[in-house]
């Protein structure tokens, strides 16, 4: 299963979130939850009028169960405006 999403959250906040998860491991620039690989990519050049909005592409790829669990955890953490 693949989840490929674009979030209006700075890369550093997302990295901090995954780094704080006891069952998530880091491997270089990627994170792993079970057999789910999590790749974070900063997106530059997105403007909302005169303001630049931080954007991060998040790609979760792996077995359906692993992807659903970690995606739900991430989604619930950052669901509210401003996370």
Per-segment meaning from a language model:
Residues 1-26:
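Short Lys/Arg-enriched alpha/beta "domain-start" segment
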Residues 28, 35, 55-57:
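Broad gene-expression machinery/nucleic-acid interaction feature
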Residues 16-23, 72-83:
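Short, intrinsically disordered, mixed-charge
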Residues 6-9, 42-44, 62-66, 78:
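Beta-strand elements of well-folded, non-transmembrane domains
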